[in-house]
Amino acid sequence: MAQNFSTVGDGKQMLLERDSSKRVLTGCFLSLLIFTTLLGNTLVCVAVTKFRHLRSKVTNFFVISLAISDLLVAILVMPWKAATEIMGFWPFGEFCNIWVAFDIMCSTASILNLCVISVDRYWAISSPFRYERKMTPKVACLMISVAWTLSVLISFIPVQLNWHKAQTASYVELNGTYAGDLPPDNCDSSLNRTYAISSSLISFYIPVAIMIVTYTRIYRIAQKQIRRISALERAAESAQNRHSSMGNSLSMESECSFKMSFKRETKVLKTLSVIMGVFVCCWLPFFILNCMVPFCEADDTTDFPCISSTTFDVFVWFGWANSSLNPIIYAFNADFRKAFSILLGCHRLCPGNSAIEIVSINNTGAPLSNPSCQYQPKSHIPKEGNHSSSYVIPHSILCQEEELQKKDGFGGEMEVGLVNNAMEKVSPAISGNFDSDAAVTLETINPITQNGQHKSMSC
C-alpha cells in the first residue's frame, strides 16, 4: 500500500514538473511575441514622429494608425492573457469586462486599418490624379476616425451593457462549468450568437472581402501596366536593332522580354499573396471558431465540447500575432528601413552606407545603373556637357526632406514608369528591383496614355 502511495506521489510530482516546464516555455514564447510586437510598432511610431519626410506622406497616416492599434494590442490585451496562461487562472478580478472590450476594440481597429490601407492603395493606383487631389490629410484622418469609431462602438458599448454575453449554454458551460458557479478568478469571455456573428462580420468578414477585391484589382492593374511596358521595351529594342543592323538577335531579346515580364508579374503576385496570406492565416481560424462556439451544444455522451479551450486560445494568439507581423509587411519600405537603421544606430555599422557616395550621371542626365549605390537621384539632375560626370552626394541627404520624392511601398520600392531618354526605356527603379530578389511593392503605378507615354504626377 505504501508503495502504491509512493507511486501516486511520484506521478503527481512528474505531472507538476511537466506542467511547470510547459508554463515556463509558454511564458518565454509569449513574452518574445509581446516584445517583438512592441518593438516593431514602437519603431514605426517613433520613425514617423522623428522624421518629417515620413509624416508628410498621407499614406503613412494609415500606417501609423495601424501601428498604434497593434501597439495597443501588445499593451492592453496580450500581457493580461499571457499572465493568465502562465498562472492558470485570471488574477485581475473585475478588470475582465474592460479587458474583453479592449480585446475586441484593438483587434477590430487593427483589421479595419488594414482594410483602409488596401482601399487607399487601390485608389492611389486606379485613379492617381484624383487621388492626388482628393486624398488630403483631412480625408485620411476622416477614414481613420471611422475605423476607430466603429471599433469602439462594437466593443465598449455592448460589453459594458452585457449585450455580448451568452444567455444560454455558454462556452464555459460546455467545458463543465456553469456561469453561475464561475469562480472569481475566471474571466468568462463567451459571446452570444447574435453578437458573435454581427461582430465577426464587422471586424473580419466584411473587411477581408474588401481587401480581396481591392488587392485582386491592384494585381490586374499592375499586370496590365507591366505588359504594356514590356511591349514598349520590345518595340524600342526592335527599333534600335534595326537602326544598328542587328536584327538577328530580335527573337532572343523578345524571348528575354517575355521572361522579364513574367518575372515582374510573379513578384507582384508574391507581394500581394504575402499581404493577404499572412492576414488570412492569422485571423481566419479564430473568426471561424468565434462563430462556431456559440452554436456548440453540450453532449451527454462525452465530457468534451465541440471546441476545446486550448484550441480556441491557440488561435486567439494566432490572431494577435498578426500585430507583430504588420510592421514588417506595411512599414518595411526603403524610407522606413533607413529611418529604422538611424534609430537603431545600424547605419554606422553598414559598410554600404558611407558618409559620401558617388553617383555617376550619363550624358542624358539619367543616373547610370550601379547596384552598389544606396542612393540614386532622379533624372531631373542637370546635364553637364556631353560626357558622363560624377556628383558627390552627402549620405545625410537620405534623411532630409529632399527625399520626399522617393516612392513609398509595402516591402520595397516599385515604380512602374518610363524615362524619356534617346528612346523609351524602363526606369531604373523597375530594373533594379525586378532583376534582383528584392521584394516588390505596389503603391503608385503611373497611368499610361494612349500613345504609350507615362503621365507625370503633379503634387
Swiss-Prot record:
Show the SUPFAM superfamilies listed in the entry.
Family A G protein-coupled receptor-like
InterPro entries per record:
Dopamine_D1_rcpt, Dopamine_rcpt, GPCR_Rhodpsn, GPCR_Rhodpsn_7TM
Q: Which residues form a coiled coil?
A: none
**Which residue spans belong to the Extracellular compartment?**
1-23, 88-96, 165-191, 298-311
Q: Which residues lie on this side of the membrane: Cytoplasmic?
A: 50-60, 120-138, 217-269, 334-459
Q: Which chain regions cross the lipid bilayer?
A: 24-49, 61-87, 97-119, 139-164, 192-216, 270-297, 312-333
Keywords, ordered alphabetically = Cell membrane, Cell projection, Disulfide bond, G-protein coupled receptor, Glycoprotein, Membrane, Receptor, Transducer, Transmembrane, Transmembrane helix
Identify its membrane topology class. Answer: Multi-pass membrane protein
- Give the location in the cell: Cell membrane; Cell projection, Cilium membrane
One GO BP: vasodilation
Q: Name one Pfam family in it.
A: 7tm_1
Q: Which residues are glycosylated?
A: 4
PROSITE patterns this protein is in?
Answer: G_PROTEIN_RECEP_F1_1, G_PROTEIN_RECEP_F1_2
User: What molecular function terms (GO) are annotated for this protein?
Assistant: dopamine neurotransmitter receptor activity, coupled via Gs; G protein-coupled receptor activity
Secretion signal span? none
Q: List the disulfide bonds.
A: 96-187
GO cellular component terms, alphabetically, are: ciliary membrane; synapse
Q: What does this protein do?
A: Receptor for dopamine.
The family this protein is said to belong to: Belongs to the G-protein coupled receptor 1 family.
Protein name per the record: D(1)-like dopamine receptor
Which organism is the protein's source? Answer: Takifugu rubripes (Japanese pufferfish)
